Amino acid sequence: MKIILSILCFSYIFAQYDYILEDINPNSSTYGEIIAPSVFNNQVTLHYFGHQNWGTCTARVGQLNDLYQDLLDNEIVNVRIVAIGKGGSYENSNSNWINNTSMPILIDPVSYEVWESWGAGQRDLYFLDSEGSYVNDFNITSWNYNQIYNQ
């Protein structure tokens, strides 16, 4: 019985922090590819959830893209950052996230299953380790990127 419960628990955890979505950012190295956390094996991943039509969410995507570029510029290639927006009417504002960014931009279809299964809220940032396991999450609504970056 313990083995069955362990398998069920593992399956729930794996399913909770998984998805299969297409990268819609033509500036991204994975543009047009189907992205899932398992694609980033052996890389720490940050998953940002936001609304493409909100200014603060768009600003956070820009800041995370700056962070991603700084990591790449310093040859830190074992960290990936992706942004996960929402489908439906939110998709009319996809260009807000795509312009001037090079990180993968993913869109959760109208049912928002990824947002729901992760328990994500607007401007939540989730961290998965290099094995795809959950590490931590927090909301970056009041995040002062410049203050953090310059420390």
Which sequence ranges carry the predicted segments?
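Sec-dependent N-terminal signal peptides
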Residues: 2-15, 102
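N-terminal "domain-start" segment that seeds a small globular fold
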Residues: 13-38, 59
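Conserved redox-active cysteine motifs that mediate thiol-disulfide chemistry
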Residues: 41-66
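Structural recognition of the beta-strand scaffold that forms the well-ordered cores
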Residues: 45-49, 78-85, 104-107, 124-128, ...
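Solvent-exposed loop/turn segments at secondary-structure junctions
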Residues: 51-56, 86-91, 109-113, 133-134, ...
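Active-site-proximal cofactor/substrate-binding loop regions of enzyme domains
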Residues: 59-70, 74-81, 87-96
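Short, internal strand/loop/helix patches
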Residues: 95-128
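Thiol-/selenol-based redox modules, centered on thioredoxin-like
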Residues: 127-151
